[in-house]
Swiss-Prot record:
One of its GO terms (cellular component) is cytoplasm. The gene is prpE. It comes from Bacillus thuringiensis (strain Al Hakam). Belongs to the PrpE family. PANTHER family: BIS(5'-NUCLEOSYL)-TETRAPHOSPHATASE PRPE [ASYMMETRICAL], METALLOPHOSPHOESTERASE. This is Bis(5'-nucleosyl)-tetraphosphatase PrpE [asymmetrical]. The keyword GTP-binding applies. Asymmetrically hydrolyzes Ap4p to yield AMP and ATP. Keywords: GTP-binding, Hydrolase, Nickel, Nucleotide-binding.
Amino acid sequence: MKYDIIGDIHGCLQEFQNLTEKLGYNWSSGLPVHPDQRKLAFVGDITDRGPHSLRMIEIVWELVIHKKEAYYAPGNHCNKLYRFFLGRNVTVAHGLETTVAEYEALPSHKQNMIKEKFITLYEQSPLYHVLDEKRLLVCHAGIRQDYIGRQDKKVQTFVLYGDITGEKHADGSPVRRDWAKEYKGTAWIVYGHTPVKEPRFVNHTVNIDTGAVFGGRLTALRYPEMETVSVPSSLPFVPEKFRPIS
């Protein structure tokens, strides 16, 4: 099986359409379909900050749950939206406010439909996908080699948020260790979460979050070819979001 793994979309629907078309997908049915049966995989954070979060929920639900033709691993923004839809007490900030504004503008029956689709998508998707006979892992923020195969709370925190230290940068964002430098496995780990200006290959890991929602690019990794394909963002560039990884 051949996969096209898509970085953090964050509601950037036009960029997602442009990228999939560049990858050879056809949208005539209303969904991206590849003539050679390649499968899409998403590293999570499909919503928040960008203009079309709810449409992205519908598309990914259709591909993953209804048609079972794609793979989705939830991100930290997905986790927060899931908790919001469950009625938990979450702070509507850091991008969630854009998704909530879209949601609250809908009539109640459409709200219920979106809520049910996203809850189903989240609950029926694993923390990370192990594909191609364990040669490929797709997850949101990465995973340590000794965590592969586990699903406990410690692993969930790592997969959703990265290798956080508990410390904060001056802007309030978490300080993260560079786990990829320590990875010694042979399986390729493809992830996003931390915006980088260029796809970052370190050992057998690839960060493909090139900051589409911050004016960078939306990037896909073609597997097993190990080629990256990107399209430019239509949004303003926010340079401070592309923090160097120590």
